[in-house]
Amino acid sequence: MPSDQPVATGVSSEEIVSKLKNLGVDHVICIPDSYQKTLIARLTDDPDISFMIACTEDEAIGINAGLYIGGKNPVLVIQNNGIFASINTIKAIPLDAKIPTLMFVGQFQRDPMLPIEESKSRAVRMVEPTLETWGVPYYRIETPEDIGNIELGYKLAYDTLGPVAIIIGAPTI
């Protein structure tokens, strides 16, 4: 049942980019996502981060791996449906080949007034169970107070040499 206050509120794209820069991120590979459009716009204009658009999530994960092997520090920006579309590639590259892969996952079709578990969108409801099934850790960013989860997710991806998802629960601002 919806409350009168949103469960998830937008997080500043400026703060997200600042966190990424503090972590040394130098490349972002993106499949455009309407939930993260302000983040994408800010990244596109940032001279310190190389921003590229891939055609598919599979391609983005492969580019991420190549950049990492080449000594770069990339992250991905995708939407929730991309998790489902690329699960075999997530298994093969970040999990099996042990490539750190931090994925910002926008919850396309999420109603920020409802908890994820109550969403009418199957894609919104099934992202976390899918990640759990494959052993992919995730953190939520539901409010500006969750911004520290970016650093936690980044460190976990590099400590475990694997994938970690940062689930963006409301459109970035």
What does each model-found stretch correspond to?
Residues 1-173:
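Thiamine diphosphate
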